[in-house]
UniProtKB/Swiss-Prot annotation:
Lineage of source species: Bacteria, Pseudomonadati, Pseudomonadota, Gammaproteobacteria, Enterobacterales
The organism of origin for this protein: Escherichia coli
Disulfide bonds: 814-832
Membrane topology: Multi-pass membrane protein
The protein, known as: Outer membrane usher protein PapC
Subcellular location: Cell outer membrane
Pfam family, one: PapC_C
A cellular component term, taken from the record's GO annotations: cell outer membrane
Family label: Belongs to the fimbrial export usher family.
InterPro entries: Fimb_usher, Fimbrial_membr_usher_CS, FimD_plug_dom, PapC-like_C, PapC-like_C_sf, PapC_N, PapC_N_sf
Gene Ontology MF annotations: fimbrial usher porin activity; identical protein binding
GO annotation terms (biological process): pilus assembly
Signal peptide: 1-24
Length: 836
């Protein structure tokens, strides 16, 4: 039998050539005399005699419209022969029966949908009313390709899909976490253990998302034999939300923060309806706030707003930049930098956006009603209603305003934004507040704000003067009113605030410059100033490529006093990594360090080693060492750091972040996924160990994994890493796309085959063989091969022990059981028994 294998392969090659020829002709009649077949009458050529012919029946196919998949997974599509009309009517090819639900996924305009009619008892779409639509099935590849003129489709671009293509995902549960632990020992004998955590738990059902944010910590210290322990845990908020694509808005119920572009943010319990710029094409969207600073050691950075933790992570020593905050965050943020020696520095960042401009004819709005909430879940104050809106009056002008109505507290704001063209964009507004406090007088005051933004294209620079704000002594925000009424706290009444951001690139010098400055004055306490300035340059010298020099300075608060820091870093490529020198100054102390940093494992692992001298400040010099390591595994993002200061302290810290996602389609542990955000559950057909998303995600033993770097409402592309696939695994559908609504658990299925490649001889119960050209499919409906001369079939992706189906004349005729001990390099004689 082995001697006949080359001949069998030639027969299969002949069939492939015939099928290719059929694609170029409308109809073909075959001369079977050229084939060396034992029974030339037992040949099923129906699938080759017409171009695009598909045997009637059901197929599992991926529907591709203009190169883009329309569904999370392959769809079960029936091929139906159209009914004959008249005695002499020509028999038509079986047609793909696309249901109305499938058609709605294609992104057709409303006018185009009206032109689609249905046949076969209203089950199958007919696109003859849309000229230019071309449907081409390829059952071997498991694909149904549809080419459609763009005129029939809604607007889309390379990064955005229309709302009709947005996916609310599948039902499921999630748990996201972020853990940080530090153990430190003081030279004088004291030691401390600190552990903090925060995250989100939630569940999805249809378009609705239920979320609960949590945070907690435990601190234990021992000094002079005395042990103290502090523990705390809180559910910081509970809320329910969903997207309303038709209104380009989000509906939120429960505990939330008012993220206003006009009024100061405050917490509340109630309901809100807010337009969401993320539902617009990317070029029309807003921005996300960025936070920069300097860490003197491997430090923990905590970003919070009104006590709720938004970001908590470890950063290595030196300048840091946090850019992955949610774009919906508005208002003043509190930033705390916790050094390894326990020292804490604080500063604030105002996330005021660029001038409030809206495209002509569009309206952006926010409507909120409820009761104000303190740091816990208790509500306080009267029921309030607030709203704000911006209307694009023309290409140059936008009008905006808002109001807060709460009985004893009311505020009204009005303003305008002006696109000056070449000079930039400008906006100005005024807010009037009236606050009546029981038993005291009424406070009335105004607050003026001026904002400016300009992009200098020729100079490759941005400047944002996002505020000058002046507030009268008796002006009150809602938060200040609540503090005065319920806590008799009239302190920290703002007077003037300046915020300036400047970014400048000098391409000829490979130099970048960044400045962030904020100044806040008060009526009753001393002013505060915060700034961060940095200059970075890259150049080549003495044959070394990519030498970098960076200089930065910043101001923060330490023990209620201003703390100025400066940092210098010089880095030189060395081997696969980077050698560096850094010098820093803070509180009259100077630190000089030499170090080495490297990444490996395709960027999934990195480490840094540093050693140096700490001197100045009237204290003796101290040697200092620290090391930092991070690893991104498929299950979690992990990092560890260690530091030691001579006659000072020794500390060790670890952190981990990740989550668990559980759905009816599968479950997996995963890295990333903070705050219950959008994610994509990928399914590799039950095949484990498949690398996805550049190897950052590897499917588990059940063939599922979770991709968390998914942007809501964007067109996201996720692919199998073909270079890292195991030898016995083949991906026939290796790229999927998704456009998920906020908080969705998306689901996409890759077509992955794992198994052997076999030569099999198929025999029917009477000793005959299936006809030449019969199709062999797996239990999942995937075509694995076709029958050639004498029942010989070359099959790929066969799993030992599975049952295969053999199809001809438009239906399953018999089934084949593959032995558990199938061997690839042998021919197998397999009986094909009638379907049960």
């Amino acid at each position: 039998m082995k001697d006949r294998i080359p001949f069998a392969v030639n027969n299969i090659t002949c069939v492939i050539l015939l099928s290719l020829f059929c694609n170029a002709a409308s109809a073909v009649e075959f001369n079977t005399d050229v084939l060396d077949a034992a029974d030339k009458k037992n040949i099923d050529f129906t699938r080759f005699s017409e171009a695009g012919y598909v045997l009637p029946g059901q197929y599992l196919l991926d529907v591709i419209v203009n190169g883009q998949s329309i569904s999370p997974a392959s769809l079960q599509i029936s091929f139906v022969e159209p009914a004959l009309s008249g005695d002499k009517a020509e028999k038509k090819l079986p047609q793909a029966c696309l249901t109305s639900d499938m058609v709605r996924l294609m992104g057709l305009t409303a006018e185009s949908l009206d032109k689609v009619v249905y046949w076969h008892d209203g089950q199958c779409a007919d696109f003859h009313g849309l000229p230019g639509v071309d449907i081409r099935p390829d059952t071997g590849a498991g694909v149904l390709r549809i080419n459609m003129p763009q005129a029939w489709l809604e607007y889309s671009d390379a990064t955005w899909l229309p709302p009709s293509r947005w996916d609310d995902g599948i039902p499921g549960l999630m748990l996201d976490y972020n853990l940080n632990g530090t153990v430190s020992r003081n030279y004088q004998g004291g030691d401390s253990h600190q552990f903090s955590y925060n995250g989100t738990v939630g569940g999805n059902l249809g378009p609705w998302r239920l979320r609960a944010d949590y945070q907690g910590s435990q601190e234990q210290s021992r000094y002079n034999g005395e042990k103290t322990t502090n523990r705390n845990f809180t559910w910081s908020r509970f809320y329910l939300f969903r997207a309303i694509p038709r209104w380009r808005a989000n509906l939120t119920l429960g505990e939330n923060n008012i993220n206003s572009d006009i009024f100061r943010s405050w917490s509340y319990t109630g309901a809100s309806l807010e337009s969401d710029d993320r539902m617009l094409p990317p070029r029309l969207r807003g921005y996300a706030p960025q936070i920069t600073g300097i860490a003197e050691t491997n430090a923990r950075v905590v970003v919070s707003q009104q006590g709720r933790v938004l970001y908590d992570s470890m950063v290595p020593a030196g300048p840091f930049s946090i850019q992955d905050l949610d774009s919906s965050v508005r208002g003043r943020l509190d930033v705390e930098v916790i050094e390894q020696n326990g020292r804490k520095k604080t500063f604030q960042v105002d996330t005021a956006s660029v001038p409030y401009l809206t495209r002509p004819g569009q309206v952006r709005y926010k409507l909120v009603s409820g009761r104000s909430r303190g740091y816990g879940h208790e509500t306080e104050g009267p029921v309030f209603a607030t709203g704000e809106a911006s209307w694009g009056l023309s290409n140059q002008w936008s009008l905006y305003g808002g109001a807060v109505l709460a009985g004893d507290y009311n505020a009204l704001a009005a303003g305008a934004g002006w696109d000056l063209g070449v000079p930039g964009t400008l906006s100005a507004d005024i807010t009037q507040s009236v606050a009546r406090i029981e038993g005291e007088r009424t406070f009335q005051g105004k607050s003026w704000r001026l904002s400016y933004s300009k992009r200098f294209d020729n100079a490759d620079a941005d400047i944002t003067f996002a505020g000058y704000r002046f507030s009268e002594r008796n002006y009150m925000t809602m938060e200040q009113y609540l503090n005065a009424r319920y806590r008799n706290d009239y302190s920290s009444r703002e007077k003037e605030m300046y915020t300036v951001t400047l970014n400048k690139n000098v391409a000829d010098w490979n130099t970048s410059f960044n400045l962030q400055y904020s100044r806040q004055t008060y009526w009753d306490i001393r002013k505060t100033d915060y700034y961060t300035v940095s200059v970075n340059r890259y150049f080549n010298v003495f044959g070394l490529q990519g030498v970098a020099v960076g200089l930065s300075a910043s101001r923060s608060k330490y023990l209620g006093r201003d703390n100025d820091s400066a940092y210098l870093r010089i880095s030189v490529p060395l081997g696969t990594g980077t050698a560096s020198y850094s010098g820093s100054m803070s509180n009259d102390r100077y630190v000089n360090m030499a170090g080495y940093t490297d990444t490996f494992n395709d960027g999934l692992d990195s480490y840094s080693l540093n050693a140096g001298l700490n001197s100045g400040g009237g204290l003796t010099s101290q040697r200092q060492i620290n090391a930092y390591y991070s690893h991104r595994s498929p299950l979690a993002n992990l990092s560890a750091n260690i530091a030691s200061l001579q006659k000072g302290y020794t500390s060790f810290g670890v952190s981990a972040s990740g989550g668990a996602t559980i759905t009816g389609k599968g479950a997996a542990l995963h890295a990333g996924g903070m705050s219950g955000g959008t994610r994509l559950l990928v399914d590799t057909d039950g095949v484990g160990g498949v690398p996805v998303d550049g190897g950052q995600v590897v499917t588990n033993r059940w063939g599922t994994g979770v991709v968390t770097d998914i942007s809501s409402y964007y067109r996201n592309t996720t692919s199998v890493d073909l270079k890292r696939l195991p030898d016995d695994v083949e991906a026939t559908r290796s790229v999927v796309e998704s456009a998920l609504t906020e908080g969705a658990i998306g689901y996409r299925k890759f077509s992955v085959l794992k198994g052997k490649r076999l030569f099999a001889i198929l025999r029917l119960a009477d000793g005959s063989q299936p006809p030449f050209g019969a199709s062999v499919t797996s239990e999942k409906g995937r075509e694995l091969g076709m029958v050639a001369d004498e029942g010989l079939a070359w099959l790929s992706g066969v799993t030992p022990g599975e049952t295969l189906s053999v199809n001809w004349d438009g239906k399953i005729q018999c089934q084949v059981n593959v032995p558990e001990t199938a061997i690839s390099d042998q021919q197998l004689l397999l009986p094909c028994t009638p379907q049960k």
